[in-house]
Amino acid sequence: MSNSRIKNGFGLVSNTVLRDPELSIREKGVYSYLATYADGHDNSLTVSVNRIASECGITQSTVKRILESLVNKKVITREKRMSMQSYRTVLLK
């Protein structure tokens, strides 16, 4: 593995997600982005809607719609964190 790859890291995305015809390319893209933040032990992460929007080049409202769709399709779960205005997200597939 090259040093730049180790230094910059990477995310793993399940073929189940990438090959799912029920998921749009935007849903697959945001899911793949989330995978770069996922903890290796339980696939959980916390990243702001603002950061997702900024780094993916889409609006915050689009991010919110995509996250809601991924929850409805049971690809991720999201739970509001106590005492914070953030969500804990878990990748399910």
Where are these regions (language model features)?
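Short, Lys/Arg-enriched N-terminal segment that forms or immediately precedes the first helix
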Residues: 8-22
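Winged helix-turn-helix DNA-binding recognition segment
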Residues: 19-21, 25-26, 36-93
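N-terminal leader segment of winged-helix/HTH proteins
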Residues: 1-8
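Pre-recognition alpha-helix immediately N-terminal to the DNA-recognition helix
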Residues: 29-33
